[in-house]
Amino acid sequence: MSEELNEHMQVRRDKLAEHMEKGLDPFGGKFERSHQATDLIEKYDSYSKEELEETTDEVTIAGRLMTKRGKGKAGFAHIQDLSGQIQLYVRKDMIGDDAYEVFKSADLGDIVGVTGVMFKTNVGEISVKAKQFQLLTKSLRPLPEKYHGLKDIEQRYRQRYLDLITNPDSRGTFVSRSKIIQSMREYLNGQGFLEVETPMMHSIPGGASARPFITHHNALDIELYMRIAIELHLKRLMVGGLEKVYEIGRVFRNEGVSTRHNPEFTMIELYEAYADYHDIMELTENLVAHIAKQVHGSTTITYGEHEINLEPKWTRLHIVDAVKDATGVDFWKEVSDEEARALAKEHGVQVTESMSYGHVVNEFFEQKVEETLIQPTFIHGHPVEISPLAKKNKEDERFTDRFELFIVGREHANAFSELNDPIDQRARFEAQVKERAEGNDEAHYMDEDFLEALEYGMPPTGGLGIGVDRLVMLLTNSPSIRDVLLFPQMRTK
């Protein structure tokens, strides 16, 4: 296979040398286009063959040569740009001998520029009849075979550029991703939020339960952590009086890779002063519905075998009620840590001997309920042990004013009425430090600088974090997070 490939590559290099000997630049410069491929198809598709023959408008397009056929003095080809493909009709007597030799020697994958007029073939295909043909970039490697290339899913991720060339669905996914993030910004800016940027390297990792990546700052000779969340710096801005802020940025967690997880991923976090988690629920469903309408024109989408209705209002369910509905176990009752672990064993829920009541409730939910939540559902009231940055619920202090959003059995968002009591926050951090000492390496660190900021006073605040990659998965019907990351993390070959 390698000898065959090298032979093909040598042929292309020989053609490259021939072009250069003739004074042609096989890696040209700027090329002005008048249209993209699908613009022309949409504009002229309604024209009859005869009507198109009467038009004299010249068009100029450019793209990658994807097919080529024909012998003698005429040939057909398809070129592809970001918008799609369009057919070319190239005749020697129209473009001249030299340009036709360039066309004849062109290989699939070459990037070409064409000026011509529109016409429709006998079978009704909108095409460009070339008057000028120019090689813009010589491709020195053959593309994967049309029907046999890039079937290897791992190759698609490792060589995303080939995937984008050969797979229009993949191109569409990443165009949609850009639209999703743009729509997110438009909505929040329209609601008066201020977009900010905060550091990606932290002296103390915080804002989430996760293992961080560690790096070293040579000039300062200190260890730094790639951020595992955006949260704590944005809360400092709330203390500073920036009342509605958001950030869209990369977050890094030194954890496993799966269809739902990548060590480097994109989040949006936002905070609104004088709001609580009920307000943030409403904002979340309106934000996601707005994005769906912008991308799909509808709040009804398809994901896998499911039809998902994103039209507000979404289901709201307390975590204890969700567990009770699924298993019959009632955690509203006063239950000791030992009794909670015994209930877990009885119902086949995997827990460790160090887990408290709140951790057990969460394990019940994750193992028995989470994957059953197909339509958008806000699960709220998480136990205080697993929510160190959320306000306690005033009616039952075992729980917090927190919610997570689940769609198609996956968490898509996490939000709180933010804890702004520095004394309570210190106690929560101390409990987390104890957990870390007992072996939970995802427990929160003590963060004295953040506590000092809270002591100056943070207004009552509602906060939200959304996993952008998972939202893109949902809105593009993509089964794996790697399908929505241009360059996902891969094991070194």
UniProtKB/Swiss-Prot annotation:
Its EC number is 6.1.1.6. One of its GO terms (molecular function) is tRNA binding. Mg(2+) 1 binds at residues 404, 411. It catalyses: tRNA(Lys) + L-lysine + ATP = L-lysyl-tRNA(Lys) + AMP + diphosphate. This is Lysine--tRNA ligase. Its cofactor is Mg(2+). GO terms for cellular component: cytosol. It comes from Oceanobacillus iheyensis (strain DSM 14371 / CIP 107618 / JCM 11309 / KCTC 3954 / HTE831). The lineage of its organism: Bacteria, Bacillati, Bacillota, Bacilli, Bacillales. Binds 3 Mg(2+) ions per subunit. Belongs to the class-II aminoacyl-tRNA synthetase family. Keywords: Aminoacyl-tRNA synthetase, ATP-binding, Cytoplasm, Ligase, Magnesium, Metal-binding, Nucleotide-binding, Protein biosynthesis. The keyword Endoplasmic reticulum does not apply. Homodimer.
